[in-house]
Amino acid sequence: MKAIIPPENLTELLERANMMAGVSLAQIAANRGITVPKNLKRDKGWVGQLIEMELGATAGSKPEQDFLHLGVELKTIPINVQGKPLETTYVCVAPLSQIEGLTWENSLVCHKLQRVLWVPVEGERQISVGARRIGTPILWQPDPDELRLLQQDWEEIMELIALGKVEKLTARHGEVLQLRPKAANSRALTQSIAENGSLKMTNPRGFYLKTAFTAMILNKAFG
């Protein structure tokens, strides 16, 4: 299977993304010789990976933007018939130790959300995976209010992590950004700060954007 060359510039990236609008996942997969899974229970990242491949994203699972040379992160977002997001959006793994001196400005969350290409995809369960169509893409940059909310949530969450209170953080914390266990396997462990300042083992956590926030982004774009 021939790899897609990364887009040279923003215009080319947007052209590629717009060309996918209205196309089904089965059509994209067939063009690439990829088998469509019956469901996404075991292939949760399949849709995102397919679209990354079609657009020529380069980051893979590396901690950087998908189109680093363009300063753009790619995010697929499953939506219902009303165009509302069906689930929270994963941003990146949260650092749980060695966080001294880490600020919002040099955080991975800030880096990833500088500029995002949102690609909505039909996500209703009654639509088979292959029949789900891709929507119109949105190139988004957080405005000052959105940035303030993101920074505020990130700083509050990181402060609790630094105080060794990671276990007390629930998905309800944060207005727009939340912290949740990341690993599919609950036996996966990573180091985190304990309340007495030592290190302890806990499940890895990830930062996620809440659906109310992503719904706001879609509403602003589509009205």
Curated annotation (Swiss-Prot):
Record-linked InterPro entries: DNA_mismatch_repair_MutH (IPR004230), DNA_rep_MutH/RE_typeII_Sau3AI (IPR011337), DNA_rep_MutH/T2_RE_sf (IPR037057), Restrct_endonuc-II-like (IPR011335)
UniProt entry keywords in alphabetical sequence: Cytoplasm, DNA damage, DNA repair, Endonuclease, Hydrolase, Nuclease
Gene Ontology BP terms: DNA modification; mismatch repair
Pfam short name (any one): MutH
A GO molecular-function annotation: endonuclease activity
Principal subcellular localization: cytoplasm
Compartments reported by the entry: Cytoplasm
Lineage: superkingdom: Bacteria
GO cellular component: cytoplasm
Keyword DNA repair recorded: yes
Protein family membership: Belongs to the MutH family.
Reported function: Sequence-specific endonuclease that cleaves unmethylated GATC sequences. It is involved in DNA mismatch repair.
NCBIfam families to which the protein is assigned, alphabetical: mutH_TIGR, PRK05070.1
HAMAP family in UniProt: MutH
Protein name as it appears in the record: DNA mismatch repair protein MutH
Source organism (scientific name): Shewanella sp. (strain W3-18-1)
